[in-house]
Regions:
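N-terminal secretory targeting signals
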Residues: 1-2, 212-214
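Catalytic domains of cell-wall/extracellular-matrix polysaccharide-remodeling enzymes
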Residues: 65-192, 196, 203, 210-212
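Hydrophobic beta-strand scaffold residues
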Residues: 32, 58, 131-132, 198
Length: 214
């Protein structure tokens, strides 16, 4: 009996690790969703093209990840976001419809710069042709407090628990997180061996939305 589908989402790339992730996904006949930053595309244009060519999904994570920049106003946020969208569109010939807010839709850091901005942005996303996605399994890899083995154990425990009808894993694609290459290999190897499949966030997937706190 086939087990459930897992949605691996990889934020903040492209980086020098992107091609390695793509190699692993190809090796295990798996798909993922990449939420990319426009400022990282220069020098990695081939990775953006390859993401699409291999059948993965690509979403917009903004041009930059500086909270004090993107969350100063709705106008600035969308200027930043649409700049990144245009870069992706020019490389792939497709207009991305997926997006993920920097820090997620429930972030509270935005309060420092513009009170109530997340309520406005989450309502506005659809008018730009977007569906935004959060996640329900946070690797917390960016904190650098846990080894790849510890993160792997945590993610697998969350999957095996069966509490999520559509598990959406959050990982990051950054040069300072090179242990994530081993982590992704182990995730793909172990879970596909158990009968799980990895697929992309598509339009028929009900998005994970956190409660907006600003």
């Amino acid at each position: 009996m086939a087990k459930q589908t897992i949605y691996l989402t990889i934020d903040d790339g492209p980086s020098d690790l992107t091609a390695l992730f793509l190699d692993l996904l190809e090796k295990y006949n798996s798909r993922a969703t990449f939420f990319v930053l426009g400022e990282n595309i220069e020098g990695h244009q081939s990775d953006i093209k390859r993401i699409c060519a291999q059948g993965h999904a690509i979403g917009v994570h903004g041009y930059c990840h500086d909270y004090d920049v993107v969350y100063q106003s709705c106008k600035v946020f969308w200027e930043d976001n649409l700049h990144a969208r245009k870069l992706i569109e020019e490389l792939t010939g497709k207009t991305p419809w997926l997006m993920r807010f920097q820090g997620g839709s429930s972030n509270t850091v935005s309060k420092r710069y513009c009170k109530g901005i997340m309520r406005k942005l989450t309502r506005q996303a659809a008018s730009y042709g977007y569906v935004y996605h959060d996640w329900n399994i946070d690797s917390e890899d960016w904190k650098k407090q846990y080894s790849a083995e510890e993160i792997l154990k945590y993610i697998k425990a969350e999957i095996h628990d069966g509490s999520y009808s559509r598990p959406v894993i959050l990982l990051h694609d950054r040069n300072d997180l090179n242990e994530n290459v081993m982590l992704v290999e182990r995730l793909l190897h172990d879970l596909t061996s158990e009968g799980y499949t990895f697929s992309v966030l598509s339009k028929d997937i009900i998005p994970i939305h956190y409660r907006v706190s600003n």
